[in-house]
Design a protein with these regions (language model features):
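Structural motif
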Residues: 9-13, 36-37, 52-53, 57-58, 74
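Donor/substrate-binding cores of folate-linked one-carbon enzymes
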Residues: 59-141
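Short, well-ordered alpha-helical microsegments
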Residues: 17-18, 42-43, 62-65
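Hydrophobic anchor at the start of a short beta-strand
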Residues: 6, 31-33, 75, 104
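A short beta-strand-loop structural module common to alpha/beta enzyme folds
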Residues: 28-41
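N-terminal beta1-alpha1 ligand-phosphate binding loop
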Residues: 2-24
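Short amphipathic alpha-helix with an adjacent loop that forms part of the alpha/beta core around
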Residues: 42-50
């Protein structure tokens, strides 16, 4: 039985991407990392790698349709928001609205942003007067 081929598709090898990479390594996987440059290049790299699963821990760009529409190779977005929260600036919203609880949601990429099936979620109590970087690099990661 061959091991699951996992690619981390990310805009940068930031703290959350590093954490995902490390956790996957510690779980016995050998994930590859593809940094998002342009749509055509990213699609070529992922197709050539013959990945079974693409995980996007930190992505500023939309997942190309060529990738999310392939049901044999799911693309999972790590969204720094609770189930039902959609769109950019989720952490900014949680902080400015002084949300008492927040979370992280792993959801499958589909045509509509942050609207796919939820694979997993985790909620946490929001610390008082937390900075975005503290939240992102701490509880979210």
């Amino acid at each position: 039985m061959r091991s699951l081929k996992i690619i981390l598709l990310s805009s940068a090898f930031n703290g959350l991407t590093q954490r995902a990479w490390l956790d996957l390594r510690q779980s016995g996987f050998d994930p590859s990392v593809v940094l998002f440059t342009d749509e055509a290049t990213v699609c070529r790299q992922i197709e050539a790698a013959d990945a079974d699963l693409v995980i996007c821990p930190f992505l500023k760009d939309r997942v190309p349709q060529q990738l999310w529409s392939n049901l044999d190779r799911p693309v999972v977005i790590i969204h720094p928001g609770i189930v039902g929260d959609r769109g950019a600036s989720a952490l900014d919203w949680a902080i400015t609205q002084q949300a008492r609880r927040w979370g992280v949601t792993a959801l499958q990429a589909v045509e509509e942003m942050d609207a796919g099936p939820v694979w997993s979620s985790c909620e946490f109590d929001m610390p008082a007067e937390v900075r975005k970087s503290e939240l992102y690099n701490g509880l979210v990661s």
